[in-house]
């Protein structure tokens, strides 16, 4: 994160002599931009790492390929139609009231999962969109000069259904928010 925001006296060698076509969408590309994206991805992956730890520590019994930050709070693996694939013994719900750290982790989970629809914090919704774009589509960071025009017109004028547009400043704010949230998660885990 620091490397993506620290003041730079010279251009990075990987950014020199790169000739890009201007598509008038004010997109910006640089190694520092991608370091910010990698910071986001690394921070978001810590959620699932915490889930793996909790699955082992509390001996929940979720199969390795089914463990994620959502599944550790339930008692069964279900199909999309609601049919139960397998059940597991999940002692976490019983231990939440006596373990303040676990209680904090649970409420961070609630922010992320339920926050997509009902959270008063709009950053949670943006985090979900950014993560989905980084993993399955692509993210275009744009310069502030084009921010107002581009962010209002996003997908309409460019007809680019795979891209998610965000300004560099917004991405910075969201990564900083995620950094603070993951810090809280780790402190609660310890």
What are these regions (language model features)?
Residues 1-30:
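A short mid-domain helix/strand-loop element embedded in enzyme catalytic domains
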Residues 3, 7-10, 14, 41, ...:
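Generic structural signal for well-ordered, non-membrane alpha-helices
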Residues 1, 15, 30-33, 58-190:
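Acidic, Ser/Thr/Gly/Pro-rich intrinsically disordered interaction regions
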Residues 2, 25-59:
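Short, hydrophobic, well-ordered secondary-structure elements
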């Amino acid at each position: 994160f620091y490397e993506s925001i620290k003041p730079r006296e010279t251009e990075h060698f990987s950014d020199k002599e790169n000739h890009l076509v201007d598509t008038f969408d004010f997109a910006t590309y640089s190694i520092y931009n991608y370091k910010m994206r990698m910071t986001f991805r690394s921070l978001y992956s810590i959620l699932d790492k915490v889930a793996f730890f909790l699955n082992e520590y509390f001996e929940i019994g979720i199969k390795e390929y089914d463990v994620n930050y959502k599944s550790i709070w339930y008692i069964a693996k279900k199909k999309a139609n609601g049919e139960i694939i397998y059940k597991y013994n999940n002692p976490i719900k019983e231990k939440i009231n006596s373990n303040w750290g676990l209680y904090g982790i649970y409420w961070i989970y609630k922010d992320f999962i339920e926050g997509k629809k009902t959270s008063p914090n709009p950053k949670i919704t943006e985090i979900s969109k950014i993560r989905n774009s980084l993993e399955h589509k692509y993210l275009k960071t744009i310069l502030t000069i084009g921010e107002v025009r581009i962010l209002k017109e996003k997908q309409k004028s460019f007809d680019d259904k795979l891209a998610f547009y965000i300004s560099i400043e917004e991405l910075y704010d969201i990564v900083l928010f995620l950094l603070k949230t993951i810090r809280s998660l780790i402190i609660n885990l310890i």
